[in-house]
Amino acid sequence: MLRTLLKIAAGLMLGALVTAGVLYQFLGLRLVMDGGGIPRPMFVESAAEQAARVERHRAAQRAQSPPLPSPATAASETGSGAGLEAGVQTRADLETLATDPGTGTGAPGSVAAAYWTDFRGPNRDGEYREGPLRVDWPASGLTPIWKQPAGAGYASFVIARNRAFTIEQRGSNEVVAAYDVASGRELWTNAWPAEFRESMGGDGPRATPTWFDGRLFALGATGELRALDEGNGKVIWRTNILSDSGAGNLPWGMAAAPLVVGDAIVVLPGGPANQSVAAYDRATGKRLWSTMGDMQAYSSPMLVTLLGVPQIVFFSSSRLVGLSADGSKELWEYPWPVMNGINATQPIVVGDNRLFLSSGYGAGAAVIELSKASDRLTVREVWRNTRMKNRFASSVLHEGVIYGLDESILAAVDANTGELKWKGGRYGYGQLLLVNGRLIVLTEDGDLALVRATPEKHDELSRFHVLDGKTWNVPAIAGGYLLVRNLAEMAAFDLRTTR
């Protein structure tokens, strides 16, 4: 019986390989894994073809566009450390820190302000609170104000002072790029030799850059961490967090967005022997501290306050952890083992002392409650079930209800009880944000959908196609502009209510 099953499995595998070869040879199609691990035929360019297409577009863009008043100087370093002194500032030169890391200059509600400065927004919770947006989308959809080719990778955008920043794979280089939000024009790039190739997940960098106080902190898939000048992309300092920590890379690459905590940039290299979480000086790149020995995961750290205690909350491969903001003490933990350590979504703060967490691969979801006990915080499980399984699309919270993708189907769950309110609509393994009581869903197939955030029923208001190819990247919004991208394209929409 076992021998027969093995023969059948081998035959199926051989058949899949033959099918893949035929599709590629005669139709130019390749089998690409979707978020559920199912192979799907798609048109996929080679890395060289994609890089050449992006460069042709950018060259034509430069030739046709008049100069912008903001700097548009390209800066490219080889990774050897050359030219790292350019633009270095001392800590005394930095502006006084704002209470909210997302605070910047410019009029409130304008893209000139520094608002969407972190992965999934200023609070990393996927909610847009800057002001009203247009939510009267026609059923036929919206027209992008610009759309253009992009390099590979799963990073999102951050947006500050009329610029959108992201990181892409272009040929054999990882490239941080700055774009003018209104026109899509590329303002500068900073590139270094690095290639992350992964047949199931896809190629390119995963971690979204972080903007703070005129600097961009970008992490590549192979551990390269750079502080860049927002105006021209010049390197202020650089390091490799994997080399620094003696850590090996994760199977799907470094994915955690750098986190600003006071004067520090906190990252998750996952090294052994107190090297798992590390902090670097924002101004100089000097290593400040490191702690813990967990293997890391694919979620980004968050700076939150629970029970009046500021803390860094993050997923490792096997647990959710609360760490003191200075890295000196583990405050609490909640075991959360997942197949292959794939914790890839963001926890959500639910009130003063509760957190929602979820993972896919059968793990499900839970709400935990923290209480003070002496000098440590204790954890109580409020509820846990499998009604919400976020594989790598994080949920959002609206008026006591959690909205998210239960694997590939949208669902609503009561945050207090875990009760399923509804489940409906198929969006693949896409991403979603909360805006003015609506859910903006970017589907795995590249559609944009607008869904009413209500516990009553699944109510999709509009849906239309935007991007071609597998789409796992989180959308970004600032100043009324919605930006989306995937492994091959990027686009922008004007959702301002007044213009």
Where is each model-derived feature located?
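Aromatic (tryptophan-biased) beta-strands that constitute blades/sheets of beta-rich domains
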Residues: 4-7, 11, 20-149, 175-177, ...
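Short loop/turn segments immediately following the C-termini of beta-strands
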Residues: 121-124, 169-171, 221, 270-272, ...
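Extracytoplasmic beta-rich repeat domains
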Residues: 145-158, 189-210, 238-260, 270-275, ...
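Short loop/turn segments that connect beta-strands within beta-propeller blades
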Residues: 180-183, 229-232, 281-284, 324-328, ...
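Loop/turn-rich, solvent-exposed surfaces of beta-rich toroidal or solenoidal domains
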Residues: 363-365, 387-453
